[in-house]
Amino acid sequence: MNEKLPKHVSYSSYNTWLECGWKYYLTKLEDVQEGHAVWFTGGSAVHKATELWDKHGGEAETVWNDAWFQQVKEDEELNGDMNTWQFAKREDMSWWYGEGIWMLERWIKFRQGGWNIYENFIEKEYEIPVGDTTVRLAIDRVMTDFDGNRVLVDIKTGASSQRHPLQLAVYAWALQAQGISVDKAGFWDARTGTISTWNIEHLNPDRIEEMFTTFDKARKTDIFLPNFNNCGRCGVLSYCKWMNGQHTKEMGKVNG
């Protein structure tokens, strides 16, 4: 087994491996960094703002400014000048700053519509052992709705709609391991202020554990297949031997 292999796995790393095995190899084992994007900063700031409001309340504009400027400061320290960050279409830093406060206000309206935090469950992190590895994850919220149902909620800020509830099923599995059951699970869309709930009964704990143990076995036996369908949006393309990236030679034996 490669000594550089991360000791833990996550839903995100599993997704990266499915997206492109070689991208997983470059980013997780060779520490090739993807270029920072504005939507990472914007999404993180919205998450931070909802967390601050849920814990302390306050005026939306004040809460948003605190979250936004703190996130920008942290990300510039790590990723350089914001003017060098990628952005999608018109959604640049100005767009995210202006739209972010609306996203927070939609969350506040959602909360005031009868949705309450279940037992202070806000941004909880877990490490769940499975097979020969550990699954690391962070869960946004567990809430109760206006009918008293206990609901797992994941906050989404991106433009793409969710196509599958696997992420919710993984989080529900982690909650069950902590002795917490939920009646429903859904994605809350910060762009619309609405929640969509999904049926995750077919993705039972055995299926989730099988998925992660199989993923772990594959990565430990160096199964890192490239996926050429996703090259157009790859952040490490310039380091990829399969596409003759401009930095390929710098990788030495990795891309040999």
Give, region by region, the residue ranges found by the protein language model:
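A non-catalytic, helix-rich entry segment at domain boundaries
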Residues: A49-E125
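Metal-dependent nuclease catalytic regions and adjoining charged, substrate-binding loops involved
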Residues: K7-V9, F87, G131, S160-S161, ...
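Short amphipathic alpha-helical segments and their helix-coil junctions
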Residues: E3-P6, G21-Q33, M82-T84, G148-V153, ...
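Short acidic, Pro/Gly- and aromatic-enriched capping/linker segments at domain boundaries
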Residues: M1-S13
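Short intrinsically disordered terminal tails
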Residues: M1, G148-N149, K253-G256
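Nuclease catalytic cores
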Residues: Y14-G58, Y97, E123, V236
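Short, flexible loop/turn motifs enriched in small residues
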Residues: S10, L18-E19, T134-A138
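Non-catalytic protein-protein interaction segments used by genome-maintenance enzymes to assemble
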Residues: F121-W173, A177-Q178, R207-M211
